[in-house]
């Protein structure tokens, strides 16, 4: 199969279940809401080494937020429910509560499988001076702070989502591959319910489980040598075509299978429109580890 002249390999992305939270952060200005969202989703690329996977899903205009202020929806994700709650408390408590003019609301809504009492636990920062209230049809806590009051919804919904939807962009140069990756991330941003948790949404250093070198067996993950252009002609199992000199990976987490599949589709379409892109493929473990398999060609049927 070819799309816009780019070969789409007949393969699949292998993805995994993960617990997902969606939090709406609002503030007096878009600038401060973005700062809080950025801080709260830091160090959240992959649970291989990061304490959670996290990212900014989208901007929400004042006309669509509970308090009529600009906001951003973020996702914080973790395979373990208990650890997700811990990460929410740490990230919201340390990175949003501390940020000027912010408030936080549940953004999972009716999609939630369960509720976590994150706001209830955050309210103890108020040292007994906090107040329980109802605002905008939501049960909230008002925590007194130097900047006035910090508003947090009492409970936040979580659900079982999908982590690790992915595809690789192979291009004639590194620059072309990066331009295509940026185009893919921009397209994915229009899809609700998903995040691209790596820096700028792009993975430069794809990894494999463990190590090939027997001296490096202590490593949990090492470079995906099969996908390194500089090892083309060096390693016997290289998967880099002769005309490819740049590769980037896009990884997607989302609230459900359909959201992740739509994000993959839109990202691939955008990437194939960039001059110099030669091939789109995906990463998997032969179907042995992940619950979900997203066939690249089936995305376009």
From Swiss-Prot:
Domain of life: Archaea
Gene (name only): ftr
GO molecular function: formylmethanofuran-tetrahydromethanopterin N-formyltransferase activity
UniProt family annotation: Belongs to the FTR family.
GO cellular component: cytoplasm
Chief localisation class: cytoplasm
Family annotation (Pfam families): FTR, FTR_C
GO BP terms in the entry: methanogenesis, from carbon dioxide; one-carbon metabolic process
Organism of this sequence: Methanocaldococcus jannaschii (strain ATCC 43067 / DSM 2661 / JAL-1 / JCM 10045 / NBRC 100440) (Methanococcus jannaschii)
Pathway(s) it belongs to: One-carbon metabolism; methanogenesis from CO(2); 5,10-methenyl-5,6,7,8-tetrahydromethanopterin from CO(2): step 2/3
Complex formation: Homotetramer.
Protein name (record): Formylmethanofuran--tetrahydromethanopterin formyltransferase
Localization annotation: Cytoplasm
Catalysed conversion reaction: N-formylmethanofuran + 5,6,7,8-tetrahydromethanopterin + H(+) = N(5)-formyl-5,6,7,8-tetrahydromethanopterin + methanofuran
Enzyme Commission (EC) number: 2.3.1.101
Function comment: Catalyzes the reversible transfer of a formyl group from formylmethanofuran (formyl-MFR) to tetrahydromethanopterin (H(4)MPT) to produce 5-formyl tetrahydromethanopterin (5-formyl-H(4)MPT) and methanofuran (MFR).
InterPro entries hit by this protein: ForMFR_H4MPT_ForTrfase, ForMFR_H4MPT_ForTrfase_C, ForMFR_H4MPT_ForTrfase_fd-like, ForMFR_H4MPT_ForTrfase_N
Keywords, sorted A to Z: Acyltransferase, Cytoplasm, Methanogenesis, One-carbon metabolism, Transferase
